[in-house]
């Protein structure tokens, strides 16, 4: 009787230990799987941060076309891709309609659907590729009858037509650049734009490229747009400054660039132009840099 009980106890203990080991192995396998996924994403040697890597500008590419090329993009060493605006354009069929949006929301446009953008972001994650979306926030389409309903009120617009004197900073930030200029100083406008960024983030977007950034004022110009839309979003930001935020005033231009760099990185267009010129002329100038030599930290520049 005692031996029978002992054998039974031994069998029960063996079964228990086997189950315990199996459970442990399952736990280990489950814990290893995410590491393997991360390892697979890092097989291409891509940068963890957008600022540190190369961005492929997929200008006017459809979302599904980008998704189909992700492996090739990763193998080519691009750590991020940049799409054209996800906002709904005032028309279709030509790239520039996307830069005349009807509002601040993701909708169906020439690039694809909201679901297709989300699918692109999810697939890009598996390769370790970040997704940057171009955002137009300086203006909307000229036909106000079709723009976002809650922005139709005149108080949300600067209503300053006429040409722009680019040595006049106020005109740069308040006058139309062919489309109606949004009142970036208005707190409601700022929140509408920020909510759009959070919508993009919810779809898996990692970064924002700001179109016409130099046409949007700074805190020193009584405008809290930039701190409002960038803080707390968890997104990387860079913008379009082009040559200078103001012409014919180097001291003011450098001060403004320093202020922009508190909130966003920006393109060093002068540097890129100098590089192109060096290739064309087969000559390298003694100083090929631009913004970096004017006091802007190199980790805030995009080339």
Specify the residue positions occupied by each region the protein language model found.
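N-terminal secretory signal peptides that target proteins for export/translocation
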Residues: 1-9
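Sec-dependent signal peptide cleavage junction
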Residues: 23-42
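Aromatic- and acidic-residue-enriched carbohydrate-binding clefts of CAZyme catalytic domains
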Residues: 40, 49-53, 89-122, 150-183
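Active-site-proximal helices and loops of the catalytic beta/alpha 8
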Residues: 41-52, 68-71, 85, 92-99, ...
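Glycine-rich, aromatic-flanked loop segments that form ligand/cofactor-binding clefts
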Residues: 76-86, 116-142, 146-163
